[in-house]
Amino acid sequence: MKKHLLFLILCLMGILTSCSQKHTRYYIGVSQCSDDEWRHKMNHEIVREALFYDGVEVEIRTAKDNSRNQIEDINYFIDRKVDLLIVAPNEAAAVTPVVEKAYGLGIPVVVIDRKILSDRYTAFVGADNCEIGKDVGQYIVNRLGGKGKILEITGLEGSTPAMERHRGLADALKAEPGIEIAASVDGAWLQSVAGEKMDSILQDNKDINLV
């Protein structure tokens, strides 16, 4: 996804054919929901790729897993009149209105990794999370031989990958009455949170076969 992200953005803006105009500047705002390691790498690759094109400026702001911060960040980019906005939404419901606001003002919006709750954006770059959930469900069925109890640790409640992966998992397990989701907890996409909740659940549920 990261490899082709900026190319998609530049194509949307028409920059690839107009960068020869020395005095033309394009300002891209990036609103990241989090600052984990793979997002740092994504940010680095976006900035690095932008260096190959004259007149492209990239500014990145990180919400640190806080939807209020992200709403402020996106409004900041709107006020700065960015030429294009890239958003990795923290929570779909909370961030949807401000993304729609940017789109309604004529700012091209590329939504990455996580979706919003409407189609008022220019493009989406991300995975098929329902299919990922189904694949995990099928792996569980094969691994447990169709019988057992599992603990599901989701991503941040309210983020579309977490919702869609849970939906895909549940769909895959519908035809498997021998497999029970004994507990489902919100790991918030954070290893420390997920680890703490997993330890707590496993202490009280010794019969869980798979996490």
Model-predicted segments: where are they?
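A residue-level marker of the well-folded mature domains of exported/periplasmic proteins
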Residues: 19-211
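Positively charged n-region of N-terminal signal peptides that target proteins for export
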Residues: 1-4
